[in-house]
């Protein structure tokens, strides 16, 4: 046998051994993992839930409205994916507890949390933001991801570890004019990610962050629904198109997989080349 052929055979054999030893295949990098995804019946959250399920995970989707949960579950189950769902308002302790309990009851534990829920209730000067708006924004966008993580950690520990992905925003690095509380809350998530990564590493739980740029969703529609405004936004990007939810989904799946087993405390920007460093 030629040397090149022998080397190729050895490489393929080693790859097969490595993949077999990890108990997964490249087609199912999240096989038998159990994933919770908050705010996952539309947009980025829905795309993430779909991708995790496509990659082999049992996914529990959630949203504040039962009809949205039912529709998302029906759609994804119709694609042959292992998906269930429950109502969850992440700002309510009883809802967070129910989300965790649902996953444990149906699938026996939790391996993955994707914290995607967020609000943006204000547009205007930071000098005009009321205390009520600050409280609502920070409660949902910062406090809830921290408490949601706290709720899943005991279940992850029972399974030997896990992965948390917190969804921030490009606004954490490049604040959007008029969205003051939202900008601040998303910057805070970078610090939350690093803090959790340090504290949870001894428990074999990795914590990373996704910072989407301008992604075409209903949440961001005021930034792109006008064609002229959309074209103007594209001019600020290195990649001259708006992002799609699916552009974020594969990154999250990677961060939750064994391929990212040596990555924690990091933020991945999916922003089409938008400047993204503090």
UniProtKB/Swiss-Prot annotation:
Activity modulation comment: Inhibited by flavonoids (quercetin and genistein), cetylpyridium chloride, phenylhexane and valproic acid. Low inhibition is observed with fatty acids (myristic acid and lauric acid). No significant inhibition is observed with barbital, dicumarol, indomethacin, metyrapone, ethacrynic acid, disulfiram, hexestrol and benzodiazepines (diazepam and nitrazepam).
Domain of life: Eukaryota
GO biological process: alcohol metabolic process; ketone metabolic process; positive regulation of reactive oxygen species metabolic process; retinal metabolic process; steroid metabolic process
Motif (Peroxisomal targeting signal): 276-278
Annotated residues for binding of NADP(+): 36-60, 186
InterPro entries associated with the record: NAD(P)-bd_dom_sf, Sc_DH/Rdtase_CS, SDR_fam
Phenotype when changing residue 195 to N: Loss of cold catalytic inactivation. Loss of cold catalytic inactivation. Switch in stereoselective activity from 3beta-hydroxysteroid to 3alpha-hydroxysteroid oxidation
Residues annotated with Phosphoserine modification: 220
Pfam families on file: adh_short_C2
Positions annotated to bind substrate: 169
Active-site annotation: 182
Subunit-structure text: Homotetramer.
Further information: Primate DHRS4s display different stereoselectivity and catalytic efficiency in the oxidoreduction of some substrates as compared to other mammal DHRS4s due to a difference in conserved amino acid residues. Three homologous proteins DHRS4, DHRS4L1, and DHRS4L2 are derived from gene duplication of DHRS4, and the gene cluster is arranged in tandem in chromosome 14.
Domain commentary: The C-terminus peroxisomal targeting signal tripeptide is important for peroxisomal import. Once in the peroxisome, it is involved in intersubunit interactions.
Protein name according to UniProt: Dehydrogenase/reductase SDR family member 4
UniProt source species: Homo sapiens
Gene: DHRS4
């Amino acid at each position: 046998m030629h040397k090149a052929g022998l080397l190729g055979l050895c490489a393929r054999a080693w790859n097969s051994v490595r993949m077999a030893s990890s108990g997964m295949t490249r087609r199912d990098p999240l096989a038998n993992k159990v994933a919770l995804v908050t705010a996952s019946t539309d947009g980025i959250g829905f795309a993430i839930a779909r991708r995790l399920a496509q990659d082999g995970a049992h996914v529990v989707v959630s949203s504040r409205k039962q009809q949205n949960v039912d529709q998302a579950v029906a759609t994804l189950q119709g694609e042959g994916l292992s998906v269930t769902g429950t109502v969850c308002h992440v700002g309510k302790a009883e809802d967070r507890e129910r989300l965790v309990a649902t996953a444990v009851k149906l699938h026996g534990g939790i391996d993955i949390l994707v914290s995607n829920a967020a609000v943006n209730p204000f547009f205007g000067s930071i000098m005009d933001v009321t205390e009520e708006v600050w409280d609502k924004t920070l409660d949902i966008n910062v406090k809830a991801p921290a408490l949601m993580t706290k709720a899943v950690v005991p279940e992850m520990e029972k399974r030997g570890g896990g992965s948390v992905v917190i969804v921030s925003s490009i606004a954490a690095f490049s604040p959007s004019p008029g969205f003051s509380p939202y900008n601040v809350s998303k910057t805070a998530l970078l610090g939350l990610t690093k803090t959790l990564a340090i504290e949870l590493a001894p428990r074999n739980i990795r914590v990373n962050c996704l910072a989407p740029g301008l992604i075409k969703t209903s949440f961001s529609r005021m930034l792109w629904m006008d064609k002229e405004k959309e074209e103007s936004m594209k001019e600020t990007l290195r990649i001259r198109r708006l992002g799609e939810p699916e552009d974020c989904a594969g990154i999250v799946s990677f961060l939750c997989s064994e391929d990212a087993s040596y990555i924690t405390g990091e933020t991945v920007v999916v922003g089409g080349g938008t400047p993204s460093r503090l």
